[in-house]
């Protein structure tokens, strides 16, 4: 099949949408999600026709969900042939969506979307692209808005589908399905038809096939147009709230690797609308998208604010939210197993513990030390007070500690609680000890019992380097 460069009204209309939302710029490299159905075939043809105008590089991704058997295989072959005819790079992904949905506890629709966008992002990285184009149209917006209303939604749900969302663009978002069908017919383009779209087994299909036609017939209105107009108006309201949310996010949230945290009191002080958006934004920073994160999840996270420390909830896609003292943390689930270690400290010498770090220890005369404040990872001890073998170890039941500046002893567990050290981090904190007597909780505090005083003559120096 060959696509002509003849100009139709469709192309001008899509071009207006592209310019209105600043979707495409010169020299963009665009990864297109092409199923072979009417919408994606139309988008492929339109963007191919605009290829020269913007000097675009186009790449096609097709995902076989392994749901429709032989029909799905023919869809892939159809799209591959299109790409061959048009001399466009073709990338095929296959995933057993029913199995994945069951494994991840998602609907097939959610699992399918997850796999598709993962494939788009993977291809984007592979080809050095900067945009992802998907073929949602005006009817999809209306259907999504109605579906969200039926499920219960906020402002974001009433917008339906954004024309531009990060690096994702939707060139057909202002085009009705009937316009797409006419365009394909006029250009003699024959899409693949997924007959499950015409079965009223699913809620979205019922909305498309029954609810919208019924409302339009009974109330004599263009429901698709009205809902799309409402969505466009609310998009501007949403943009304002998002800008406000970003401002607050930058003020009170702290990103640390694969986790993000916020002070509980700072979050509580925000308006409820901003609080919910902040939670969604925190999840987005960890996961890269918010698909699958529903209203109930957000409320569960906010309820954590009034729960005891170490309270935790699971979120979709192996993300968790937990309260750590006065912080709310959202992060990828940690899979670390409990560690146990115990090594005799070499004096003098270097003691290495895999996954924990290195300990350099040596003894000097007190006259050789001119500064006892070298930071949290270098400590000085009265060597004459140390009786017995010194080890570096992980915590054990019965460990006791006399923190510097305190009389008497306390359980190590109580010290960890006082210092607000998260429970899951405690096994990884190395302890310098003599038997059950802690000499130094590395990175935190040394023992009062082994401090250097006016009678000290020999000093044990221990330097810790984290691995």
UniProtKB/Swiss-Prot annotation:
Keywords: ATP-binding, Cytoplasm, Ligase, Nucleotide-binding, tRNA processing. ATP binds at residues 35-40. It comes from the Bacteria. InterPro entries: Lysidine-tRNA-synth_C, Phe-tRNA_synthase-like_B3/B4, Rossmann-like_a/b/a_fold, TilS/TtcA_N, tRNA_Ile_lys_synt, tRNA_Ile_lys_synt_N. It is an enzyme of class 6 (ligase). CDD domains: TilS_N (cd01992). GO terms for molecular function: ATP binding; tRNA(Ile)-lysidine synthase activity. It is found in: Cytoplasm. It catalyses: cytidine(34) in tRNA(Ile2) + L-lysine + ATP = lysidine(34) in tRNA(Ile2) + AMP + diphosphate + H(+). Belongs to the tRNA(Ile)-lysidine synthase family. Ligates lysine onto the cytidine present at position 34 of the AUA codon-specific tRNA(Ile) that contains the anticodon CAU, in an ATP-dependent manner. Cytidine is converted to lysidine, thus changing the amino acid specificity of the tRNA from methionine to isoleucine. NCBIfam families: lysidine_TilS_C, lysidine_TilS_N. This is tRNA(Ile)-lysidine synthase. The gene is tilS.
